[in-house]
A protein has these predicted regions:
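N-terminal small/glycine-rich loop or linker at the start of catalytic domains
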Residues: 1-21, 101-113, 134-151
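Glycine-rich, proline-tolerant flexible connector loops at the mouths of alpha/beta enzymes
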Residues: 42-67, 101-116, 147-151, 176-179
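Glycine-enriched alpha-helix->loop->beta-strand junction motifs that scaffold or abut catalytic
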Residues: 40, 92-99, 169-173
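Glycine-rich anion/phosphate-binding loops
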Residues: 23-30, 78-88, 113-128, 154-161
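N-terminal capping/small domains of soluble enzymes
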Residues: 1-84
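Alpha-helix-loop-beta-strand connector modules within alpha/beta enzyme cores
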Residues: 54-79, 120-141, 161-165
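Conserved C-terminal portion of the radical SAM core fold
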Residues: 139, 160-179
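Conserved, mostly hydrophobic/aromatic
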Residues: 16, 36, 90, 99, ...
C-alpha cells in the first residue's frame, strides 16, 4: 500500500445542511456539490434519501443528483438512508456510488435516528446489502456514538468491538466510526 491510500477524505455538506433552519434549493445544493467535485475529495456525502417530512433540508435528493456533473472528477458521491425505502430510492441513481446507513451500539440513538431497535437495524443492513449488490453500489455503515454515549446506554470498547465484528461477519467492508 502506498502513502496515497492511507487517508481517504470525505466532505459532508449533508451533515451541515440538514441542521439548517431553512431549506437550500436543489439548484444551489447541486452547484455547491459541483464545486466540491473539482476539489478532489475521495467521497462527497451530498445528501439523504429520507422523507422530506423528517428532514426537509434533504428533499429532492434525486433532483440534486441529476444536476451534478461528475465529468473529470474522481470523487465518489454518497447519500445516507435510514431505511430500505430510502436505500431502494438511492440505488436507482446512476451518479450515486455509495449508500451510507447510520447504525449504532446505542438503542436510544437507533430509535431517535431511524426509528428502529438493534434487531430491526440489522435487518435493514441485510436488506441494504442486497439492494447495493443488485445495483452496483457500495454500502458504508456509520457506527455512530463510537467514542461514547450521551444517552447513558452501555458503552465501552468491547461493545464497540463486538458490533464492528458483527458487521464484518455480515460482509460489510467499510465501517466509519462516527461521534
Amino acid at each position: 500500500m502506498n502513502q496515497h491510500n492511507l487517508i481517504k477524505l470525505t466532505e459532508s455538506p449533508r451533515d451541515a445542511q440538514q441542521g439548517l433552519p431553512y431549506v437550500i434549493t436543489p439548484e444551489k445544493r447541486a452547484a455547491y456539490i459541483n464545486a466540491l467535485m473539482k476539489v478532489g475529495f475521495d467521497v462527497i456525502d451530498f445528501g439523504s434519501f429520507v422523507s422530506p417530512k423528517a428532514i426537509p433540508q434533504m428533499a429532492e435528493a434525486g433532483r440534486v443528483l441529476s444536476m451534478v456533473d461528475k465529468t473529470g472528477s474522481k470523487s465518489k458521491l454518497m447519500a445516507i438512508v435510514g431505511n430500505l425505502r430510502g436505500g431502494s430510492d438511492a440505488a436507482t441513481q446512476p451518479k450515486l456510488d455509495i449508500i451510507g446507513f447510520p447504525y449504532s451500539t446505542s438503542e436510544t440513538f437507533l430509535k431517535k435516528n431511524i426509528n428502529a431497535d438493534a434487531q430491526q437495524a440489522e435487518a435493514i443492513i441485510d436488506g441494504l446489502q442486497q439492494i447495493c449488490a443488485g445495483n452496483g453500489k457500495e454500502l458504508r455503515i456509520f457506527l455512530s456514538l463510537a467514542f461514547g454515549n450521551p444517552y447513558n446506554d452501555a458503552w465501552d470498547i468491547d461493545i464497540l468491538s463486538k458490533h464492528t465484528e458483527k458487521l464484518a461477519l455480515k460482509g460489510i467492508t467499510t465501517v466509519t466510526l462516527a461521534d
